[in-house]
Amino acid sequence: MKKLFNQVLVAAGVLALLAGCASEEENVIMAPLPIVKSEFTPKTLWSASVGDGVGHYFSKLAPDYAYDKVFVASRDGVVKALDPQNGKVIWTTDLEIEGSARLSGGITAAFGKLFIGSENGVVNALDAETGEPLWASAIEGEVLAAPAADNNIVIVNTSRGALIALNQEDGAQKWTISTEVPNLTLRGDSRPTAVAGGVFWGTPSGRLAAAIAERGQLIWQQPVGQPKGATEIDRLVDVDASPLVIGGTLFTVGFNGQLIAIDLRSGQPIWKRNYSSATDMATDGSRLYLVTDKDHLVAVDTRSGTELWSNTQLEHRLLTAPKMIDDYLVVGDAEGYLHWIDRNSGEFIAQQLVNDSGFAVGPLALNDGYVIVTRNGQIKKLTIQQ
């Protein structure tokens, strides 16, 4: 019954990505679970929990590892630091004051602090050692993606098209860059990428933008997709994926747009390929791995943009962003399965049912295993046993 219920809800889950226009629905069918002969069985090293998780809400609230701690959070405001060796709680902080904290963008660990944004338009800073709340800064719009941290500032991308830099010491706003927001957008935003003195991010209007991080000066904007089609949904062109940087090349992908490689300094495209996605990518340097809007897994050569393989067997299973664990590519799905895929061929290596509440985000890699967080707030550290 649970499996059938999830399949019925797939169309609703896809439409929940939209910020409006509920009348233009499209029925989709979740692909049946592939039959996989697993080459290994992941072993659970420890288990824990954090609040009620993120529930059925859209969320990119993901765990982070820093300062020899695993940091996790729930939508309602519970934040924990866990010992990565045994899962024991080092500290717990509850950011709920009046009603749910609605945490949604994070976790980012930097400067000895944790930074977490919320749907309430608040960026919270906590002491990473003690969990003590240090400051909370009210900003313009929801924070649906993790902040970036660089050069003593914290940079957040908001649902209202504002890229905002905050002083990491006290949360004071240093600068704001505003970009156009169409009437209808996907639910979600691009996590900024800060590198080489610049900050790069995707916009709801289908562009990749670049600015000087120190003073918030816009340098260039490159179209990733152009609105086209008869309906508002057809014309969605959000760039919600976090830009990836490899050497002097920047990579991003847009919904109803393109996968594009861009010269970091000039902002000029090197190559473009027709892929549609609103999910973060992964890379091993020579290949890009992405999940398309149909939940197809694709590997692309970073130098030429040539497709190396494609796996369509998880279509519409509401996959997480792909993560690299050891020699494998790993994604979670809406029914709570983890799928291990050969990075060279795209073939399934292993499969495991972890928790039927499903996954909103993929696993966090550690040196001696990886941590997964399910939608209902269950946390497990797993390791691969051949």
Curated annotation (Swiss-Prot):
Signal sequence residues: 1-20
Organism: Vibrio cholerae serotype O1 (strain ATCC 39315 / El Tor Inaba N16961)
Quaternary structure and partners: Part of the Bam complex.
Lipidation positions, renumbered (S-diacylglycerol cysteine): 21
Residues with lipid group (N-palmitoyl cysteine): 21
Gene Ontology BP term (one): Gram-negative-bacterium-type cell outer membrane assembly
UniProt key word rRNA processing: no
HAMAP family for the chain: OM_assembly_BamB
Protein name (record): Outer membrane protein assembly factor BamB
InterPro entries linked to this entry: BamB, PQQ_b-propeller_rpt, PQQ_rpt_dom, Quinoprotein_ADH-like_sf, WD40/YVTN_repeat-like_dom_sf
Membrane topology, as annotated: Lipid-anchor
GO cellular component terms given for this protein: cell outer membrane
Subcellular location(s) per record: Cell outer membrane
Lineage: superkingdom: Bacteria
Keywords carried by this UniProt record: Cell outer membrane, Lipoprotein, Membrane, Palmitate, Signal
Gene: bamB
